[in-house]
Every structure is written in structure tokens, then in C-alpha cells.
């Protein structure tokens, strides 16, 4: 950087400003690529696992329809992620593009939970679903909320003990839907809770348990929820467990049927 009080100094300041703007743009692009890489890996791992299990006979022929439906669900996720990648140039320097529709959050939770069946069987972890009503429609970006659920459940599984349960609950209050993902795992140290939303951050407790993780999952979650104008909170006690609660707007048709 050049510093001076004359016109050359002013020109240098302008050039410095432009250089900083370019660096910001590059950082946003790097951030986007990091997000997409993280989100691609999850469904690909799921698809690979189920196909291998069908080929080696772990999944019997009579059960294959169920798992083929899960694979189809995951390929649809990949298709949506690919479209997001192709829309890279539409992203603002500080924004997430949202495609707002009405969809059933309860059904989305059930389908997302199914994709973790293999991991759950390995670790003997079960899901306890406490869903408000048979259907519960929200107004949000379907594929991005799917990413949020996937990342939160993946996180809960990673840090849960064997033979434990993860509770996912939906409740409706004041035209908002509250979604909670709660585990009874290792918990997060008090001094780390504020840092968990930072990119690439991992607590000392998680480093040994999450060798393959990028430290991006929760920062992606927060960015998506904030882009919707909603909130996400974390309640955690070390050695007891962690709960993530986020809000979404209730869909118009859900209000009319209330």
C-alpha cells in the first residue's frame, strides 16, 4: 500500500480500494465453492453406500425399492446443487439466492432422516420424531432448508454416542414454525458456542471425532437461515448434549387451514 497526501496518494488509495474489492469478490467465490463441495459430498457418500450395500447383498432384494427411493431423493438433491453451481454468477457479493415455495417441512424431515439410516444402524442411533400434525407447510427455499436439515442431523450423528437417540421436533407458534434438532452427545464447551458459526472452526472436542469434516456445515446453516430473515440458536451443555432450533415462516395455505 502507498500512503501520501498528494494526488498520487489519492490514486494509490483508489487502486488499493479496487484491489480490496477484487479480493472480496475472490473470497466470495472461494466461499461459494467451499459450500458447494461440502454439500456435494454428503449425498454422494449416501448414494455410494447404498449402491455398495445392494451390490454386496447387505440390502436384500425385497428391500431394494425403499433404498432406490432414497437414492432417487439424493440424486434430486445433487441436481439442485448442480443448478446452484451453474447460477454462481447470479450470487450477489453478500447474498444467497432463494427460490421461495410452500412445502411440507414434516415430510422433508422424514425423507432427510431416511438418508442417514446406514450411519444410524452402524452406531445404533435412533430418531425420535415429534412432528406437529401430519403435514406442516412452510414458506422457504426447499433445497436450501434440506441442506440445513442435512447438516444439522449430520452434525448430531457425528457427536452422538452409540445407543442414543436424536430428537427432531416441529412446533407452530405465532405464524412461525420452530424446528429443533437435539442430541445427547458430547456437547459444546461454553467458550466455543459463539465460534461454531465461523467457517472452518472446530472445537477441541470435535477434532478427534470429525477428521473428515470441513468445519463448514454450521456456517452454511446460519447463512441460509439468515438469508430467509429467520433465526437459529444453539443450546448446549458439555457432556449432556446439544440442541439447534431454527424458525421458518408458516406458509399461507397452512394459516388458512389453521
Task: Name every feature range the model reports, one short phrase each.
Residues 3, 99-104, 121, 126-136:
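Conserved catalytic submotifs in the C-terminal HATPase_c
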Residues 3, 7-28:
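Amphipathic coiled-coil signaling helices used for dimeric signal transmission
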Residues 73-78:
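Short alpha-helical segment of the dimerization/phosphotransfer core of two-component systems
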Residues 93-98, 137-140:
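Conserved micro-motifs of the catalytic ATP-binding
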Residues 156-157:
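Short helix-loop "hinge" at the ATP-lid/N-box region of the Bergerat-fold HATPase_c
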Residues 188-202:
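Short conserved segment of the HATPase_c
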Residues 229-230:
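Conserved glycine-rich
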Amino acid at each position: 500500500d502507498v500512503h501520501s497526501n498528494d494526488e498520487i496518494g489519492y490514486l494509490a488509495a483508489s487502486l488499493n480500494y479496487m484491489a480490496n474489492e477484487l479480493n472480496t469478490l475472490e473470497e466470495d467465490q472461494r466461499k461459494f465453492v467451499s459450500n458447494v463441495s461440502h454439500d456435494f459430498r454428503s449425498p454422494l457418500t449416501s448414494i455410494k453406500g447404498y449402491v455398495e450395500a445392494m451390490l454386496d447383498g447387505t440390502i436384500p432384494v425385497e428391500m431394494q425399492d425403499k433404498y432406490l427411493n432414497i437414492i432417487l431423493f439424493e440424486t434430486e438433491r445433487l441436481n439442485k446443487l448442480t443448478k446452484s453451481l451453474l447460477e454462481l454468477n447470479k450470487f450477489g457479493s453478500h447474498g444467497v439466492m432463494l427460490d421461495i415455495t410452500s412445502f411440507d417441512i414434516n415430510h422433508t424431515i422424514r425423507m432427510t432422516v431416511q438418508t442417514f439410516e446406514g450411519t444410524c444402524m452402524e452406531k445404533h442411533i435412533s430418531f425420535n420424531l415429534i412432528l406437529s400434525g401430519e403435514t406442516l407447510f412452510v414458506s422457504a427455499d426447499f433445497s436450501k432448508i434440506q441442506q440445513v436439515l442435512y447438516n444439522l442431523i449430520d452434525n448430531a450423528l457425528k457427536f452422538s454416542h452409540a445407543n442414543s437417540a436424536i430428537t427432531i421436533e416441529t412446533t407452530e407458534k405465532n405464524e412461525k414454525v420452530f424446528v429443533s434438532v437435539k442430541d445427547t452427545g458430547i456437547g459444546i464447551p461454553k467458550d466455543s458456542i459463539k465460534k461454531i458459526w465461523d467457517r472452518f472452526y472446530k472445537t477441541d472436542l470435535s477434532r478427534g471425532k470429525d477428521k473428515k469434516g470441513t468445519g463448514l456445515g454450521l456456517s452454511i446453516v446460519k447463512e441460509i437461515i439468515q438469508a430467509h430473515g429467520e433465526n437459529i440458536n444453539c443450546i448446549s451443555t458439555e457432556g449432556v448434549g446439544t440442541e439447534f432450533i431454527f424458525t421458518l415462516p408458516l406458509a399461507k395455505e397452512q394459516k388458512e387451514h389453521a
